[in-house]
Amino acid sequence: MRSHYCGGINESHIDQEVTLCGWVHRRRDHGGVIFLDLRDRDGMSQVVVDPDTPESFALAEKVRSEFVIKVTGRVRRRPAGTENNNMPTGQVELLGKELVILNAAATPPFPLDEHVDVGEDVRLRYRFVDLRRPEMINRLRFRSRVTSYIRNFLDSRGFMDVETPILTRATPEGARDYLVPSRTHEGSFFALPQSPQLFKQLLMVSGVDRYYQIAKCFRDEDLRADRQPEFTQVDIEASFIDEETLMGLNEEMIRSLFKDVLDVELPEFPRMPYSEAMQRYGSDKPDLRIPLELQDVGDLVESVDFKVFAGPAKDPKGRVAALRVPKGAELTRKQIDDYTRFVGIYGAKGLAYIKVNELTKGAEGLQSPIVKFLGDDVALAIMERVGAEDGDIVFFGADKATVVNEALGALRIKVGHDLNMLTCEWAPMWVVDFPMFEELPDGNLTAIHHPFTAPSCSPEDLAADPANALSRAYDMVLNGTELGGGSIRIHDEKMQEAVFRILGIGEEEARAKFGFLLDALKFGCPPHGGLAFGLDRLVMLMTGSSSIRDVIAFPKTQSATCLMTQAPGEVDEKQLKELHIRLRRSAKAVEGNKAENKE
């Protein structure tokens, strides 16, 4: 039907006859000559239709934005002075001699110009129109290129692309499962996989040795800018391998991907223990582009009369930390109030601060309502510890360590961006030596990653002191975003049972939920490990998009709905009956029916 894409004609095609197909991006009538900007996924070409071809000219008068047309004509150089150097095709135009309207179009719900700001709800409602925009189609093309590169890289390293089931059973992996009722097994449900975790481990038991999959995963959780109920991950697993080899392989893949696709030379990835990341940055995924760090000052304030600081300083689970912001004394009262409200989102009860006006004057050179409560000596000791200089501001967090880390860690990121403090464009890293477990509010332990992560100690040492055990887990972080996480897995049945016991999973429950895994561990399971990347998140970062919704063809909203298809939707009574399901109506629906009956 066509000989070339719209973005593919140039000066080498002058005097050639070509056929283009696409959407009319813009129509202009200039004194009896009609200009059409014709667009497809590869770009745009200018088509000229003049009265010398009366039939085509009559059709050109009828076309409007987003009409689908086919044009055959001769490529010619644009007249001097009318070239468009901003377009790859801007030196030439197509003199149309035969035009066919393939389909008319209703008026689009929004203009398709890149600079037009359109509400996301409208874009998602008409996603099939939104995806025609060059920036959107370019993101999909970019994603395809990234996926293709990853496949080729892993293929070349001996990995096999193996598909794992979508209909499986519910397993505790940290989020709620999406459940699928079984028609043939009354009262039973499949679950959509949160990850292929157990299946890829079983593939290692099966001798596959090196596996990968571009896998769809599903998690019924509250959504954020970088979360979707269904998402895509690059899933990797290998046998007879240690964490050093796995991290090296995946680092090589990401660095070579950035070089090939973006022509960016990423530096080698530094490694940082989890405890150090939390201590210095308040986060297990620190953004190393921002040169701000948290510093402990609890030992300096535990004896002061200021209970706001002294209380957390004496609490074994508390923390008092300072965040020095160079030149931050210029912040206005309103800005500080805004930051105070911001840290409140993370549970902080306030945001104490000290402005450093002139250190040579001692405590008199410090500006803050808390200096008098700390005492001059303590205030100056804090300034010395954090390396404060004239013109700085020092923020403080004093609370449970978890609250201080979250609040000051988030403030560090916000201030760094607000004050344009980023020192580089890309800052990758590995976070290693994660704890095996974390304590829940009720005092029980839960796995930080998942219960199949291998500890770095023996089963006996693990049982003796599980709260302080470290795991053989590792996370890849880029610009403060977790790109992927992985670990060496448990390949010994006794170790797996020991972990289950610590998590409060008894023998009967373990057998009911993971019997197939425990059986597999008895039949010669090799040492193995792996890692999974969030493909959506990776493409979001590489394209500079603000949300993964911008790099997914048909995403869900933050309330987990599809505005285009109106999913999720109700199903009819017949389908429910076949699935042996009866819906319990909400109180709101019952009240509505009562009101209708009264009428």
From Swiss-Prot:
Q: How does it assemble?
A: Homodimer.
> Please, which domain of life does this record's source organism belong to?
Bacteria
Family designation: Belongs to the class-II aminoacyl-tRNA synthetase family. Type 1 subfamily.
Q: What is its EC number?
A: 6.1.1.23
Classification via HAMAP family: Asp_tRNA_synth_type1
Work out whether the entry's keyword set contains Transmembrane helix.
no
Q: What's the chief localization of this chain?
A: cytoplasm
**Keywords carried by this UniProt record:** Aminoacyl-tRNA synthetase, ATP-binding, Cytoplasm, Ligase, Nucleotide-binding, Protein biosynthesis
What Gene Ontology molecular function terms does this protein carry? aspartate-tRNA ligase activity; aspartate-tRNA(Asn) ligase activity; ATP binding; nucleic acid binding
Protein name per Swiss-Prot or TrEMBL: Aspartate--tRNA(Asp/Asn) ligase
Q: Which reaction does it catalyse?
A: tRNA(Asx) + L-aspartate + ATP = L-aspartyl-tRNA(Asx) + AMP + diphosphate
